[in-house]
Amino acid sequence: MEVCAVRDFNDKDRTKKFSRIQLGENPANLPPETLALLESAVHAALKDGCLPCPVGWKIAKDMAIPRIAVGAVMDKLGVRIANCQLGFFKVDKTPYPDAAPQEASPEIAAGLRELDSARDLTCAAVFELTRRLRTTPMRVSEAANILGLKIGGCQLGCF
């Protein structure tokens, strides 16, 4: 089990993040009852004080709400993300602990360059690319790192 071994999400972190990303308290305009249920769901799903990315996605799916709403509640509660499906927020971002490939597959590289040139290199677009190419998000993220491309627009609002 992965331990969320990071410090608490504090006011300094919140200020830094909000200078880059403005989600607002309720970006999906959810009714107060739904927000209360969402807060409870996030609290109940915490693993060692953090919310695993796939669990955040599942909460959104189960509640039929946008993923960004889960991220906004996480910010409000001061909860950090763990287990990002693209490998962000880890020291070792490669899925291969011993010998990481030094070049991206031509198909993944072409897809990433196409997204980058269209200014659409986002988390959602990367997941669509993984479905289209029948690969994993980590492989696509690793290829982006190899190519020096930056993925943005986290569906939970983390980056």
Can you annotate each of these PLM segments?
Residues 2-159:
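Long, charge-rich, low-complexity intrinsically disordered regions
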